Amino acid sequence: MRSTMVIGATAAALTVAPLLAQQTFRTGVDLVHFAVVVTDKQGAPITGLTPEDFELVEDGKRQTISYFAEGDPSEGTKLGNALPLHLGLALDTSGSMEADIREVRTAVVKFLNANESAADVTLVNFDTEVRISRYAATEYQRLIERIRMQKPEGWTAFYDAIGVYLHGAASQNGQKILLVYTDGGDTRSAITLHELLDLLKASDVTLYVIGYLEQYPSSARTEQRMQLQRMALTTGGQAFFPMSLKDLDKVYEGIQREIAARYSLGYVSSNTRADGGWRRVQVRLNRPDLKNVKIRTRPGYFAPYREGSGR
């Protein structure tokens, strides 16, 4: 286990610039990676698709898919070498979690036991402070012990927790997924929601948020739901809002099914300018026989920046 880093709110002065490097994998060329979920009209993941079933378009220009994988990265790929899966878990341990922490811990541990394909797991506990530690796949027992030992107290540095995780994930090559559990809004962070959305847009992390908001009045609950949904959709992820803690297992099982059904698409952009600019990406399906299909992925990426590159 790596040592735990404790970060106070004033230390989380985060910017977008360091995250631009994580838009590509360093493989001799700049390979841009997109995690894609395809669902039917009932929201169930569609599996068994091939590279030929997809079309990737960047700023209106079709791109050639050079990397393709479905589901568990350990099971190999159809194009390219397998990319490792880096999993992040961010858990709200603020004072308001005192009554619910046992049920939340139990659901998280069940989820971890069902996810054996991750190369490592980064645990982020957040209350007044943010604590982050990373565990190899062989250290799951230590990770579970760490989850169980946290005691709820303090405020909620929610935005800072995600921002700190994103900066740590910038040094990782591969697929990156962050699951966040919270029971409320931010009350402590140094960064704002707008700044966090910029960080999420600049990352290649897929965010899943579970918000248990039943203690809020309806107007405040609606506002919180909209914020969490916006955060998740910025990355191609999802937000979930269980009405009871008894529903947590079902939510985590749904996330696990989606992770197992995700497609990983990679390509080398035909635009060779390293100008740091935003590039809009669309993923389409070349399967007329599949009706009412929804495709979820991030909306684009920032190109890498190298000084002297023309615009």
Residue ranges with predicted function:
Residues 4-18:
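Bacterial N-terminal signal peptides
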